[in-house]
A protein has these predicted regions:
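Short, small-residue-biased leader/transition segments that mark boundaries at the very start
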Residues: 1-2, 196
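Conserved, function-defining core regions and hallmark residues within catalytic/recognition domains
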Residues: 6
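ABC-type nucleotide-binding domain
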Residues: 11, 16-19, 23-194
């Protein structure tokens, strides 16, 4: 059912299209700026009002707020699932509306709040972040996510099957696998749905 829903989403018409002259995103520092961003999903219900902040390269920023305050909306706008109503989102000075969505999304890694794992091995689930990854790369990502020692304690190690949606792992273990997957991708910008670490 989950995959059917995902594929149905992929088949739908995109809300946002690349600009005719869109170029690939060029990242040198990975500085992120939200410049007076306003957004509404519907014209009569504005979610964001003149949001203005910068995240310097190499720093960590937390966005906190009550349910419905727009935290997830910021992430959706950064991924360009929607375009802003007013203002601009820039990465290294480039308006994300002027770059290809593929290059934008390739530059961003996300650890979602609700972890999705496939009914396959731990190695497969981590390697999904970088198709063709070597075992050494998978293990390095797992070490960085502090899950390697746990994996090695399992009888099958990296070949352990995680079960449907990762049901054979605890919530924290699933999140660490998802973190390793994202770290293996080596994104310039990392977005974490909730503080997992």
């Amino acid at each position: 059912m989950l995959f059917r829903s995902m594929f149905a989403l992929l088949d739908q018409h995109r809300e946002v299209a690349d600009a005719p002259a869109a170029k690939d995103l060029r990242i040198e520092r990975a500085e992120l700026q939200f410049n007076t961003v306003s957004f509404s999903y519907e014209s009569n219900r504005q979610i964001l009002f003149d949001v203005d902040f910068s995240v310097a390269a190499g720093t960590t920023t937390a966005v906190v707020g009550h349910s419905g305050s727009g935290k997830s909306t910021l992430a959706r706008l950064l991924f360009r699932f929607y375009d802003v109503d007013r203002g601009a989102i820039r990465i290294d000075g480039q308006d994300i509306r002027e770059v290809t969505q593929t290059s934008l999304r390739n530059a961003i890694g996300i650890v979602p709040q609700d972890t999705v794992l496939f009914n396959d091995t731990i190695a497969y689930n981590i390697a999904y972040g970088k198709p063709g990854a070597q075992q050494e790369e998978i293990e390095a990502a797992a070490r960085a996510a502090y899950i390697h020692d746990f994996i090695m304690s399992l009888p099958e190690g990296y070949q352990t099957m995680v079960g449907e949606r990762g049901l054979k792992l605890s919530g924290g273990e699933k999140q660490r696998v998802a973190i390793a997957r994202t770290l293996l991708k080596n994104p310039k910008i990392l977005e974490i749905g909730r503080a997992h670490v």
